[in-house]
């Protein structure tokens, strides 16, 4: 979002950090499409959504499967488990969750690629909890279509994001009280923050 990033935290460092603090890692990978918001800072290409060419999706999906094998594979029996062991971590990380997509527009381009990735993961690693996305907001077309896709595929969990005003949070403390807890798809709140016009932080946003 326009600020400096060292790019010094890779999967290995992230997984080790989670291990050190006793947290479950949740790496999030692109669903075969780029974030439509990533080019909005002075770049006129922002707001569009392309997709990895279908001819390259097989290789991209294999990269995702390789990451799971790298995290969980046996150090002696698997290619990527051996790579992990040679890097200094012979014990598997026991990865349980993997996110596919983040605040994406739920278009035909997205749905086709997400479905391919989801099915490939479930086929090879049926125990893996795939966390999907239902768009950038908690309402609107992408939210509705994202939930439709999650219900259709039986996605175990979706990541909902909330960037709202202090008043919204105060008036929606019971937001999930009526959530159908018998649904197969559960909700993970991966991002939330209170914003006022201009997105400046103050005591009001801190307290809500």
Feature locations, PLM:
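N-terminal catalytic cores of secreted or lumenal carbohydrate-active enzymes
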Residues: 1-146, 152, 170
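Catalytic-core region of carbohydrate-active enzymes that cleave or remodel glycosidic bonds
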Residues: 119-122, 126-129, 147-152, 156-208
């Amino acid at each position: 979002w326009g600020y400096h990033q060292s790019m010094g935290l890779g999967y290995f460092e992230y997984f080790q950090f989670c291990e050190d603090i006793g947290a479950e890692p949740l790496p999030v990978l692109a669903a075969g499409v780029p974030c439509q918001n990533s080019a909005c800072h002075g770049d006129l290409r922002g707001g569009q959504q392309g997709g990895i060419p279908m001819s390259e999706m097989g290789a991209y999906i294999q990269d995702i499967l390789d990451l799971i094998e790298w995290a969980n594979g046996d150090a002696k029996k698997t290619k990527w488990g051996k790579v992990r062991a040679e890097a200094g971590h012979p014990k598997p990380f026991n990865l349980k969750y993997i996110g596919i997509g983040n605040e994406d527009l739920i278009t035909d381009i997205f749905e086709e690629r997400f479905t391919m990735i989801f099915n490939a993961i479930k086929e090879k690693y049926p125990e893996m909890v795939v966390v999907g996305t239902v768009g950038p907001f908690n309402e609107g077309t992408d939210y509705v279509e994202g939930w439709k896709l999650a219900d259709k595929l039986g996605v175990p969990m979706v990541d909902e994001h909330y960037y709202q005003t202090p008043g919204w949070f105060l008036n929606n403390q019971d937001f999930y009280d009526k959530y159908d807890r018998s649904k197969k798809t559960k909700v993970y709140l991966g991002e939330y923050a209170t914003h006022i016009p201009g997105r400046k932080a103050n005591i009001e946003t801190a307290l809500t």
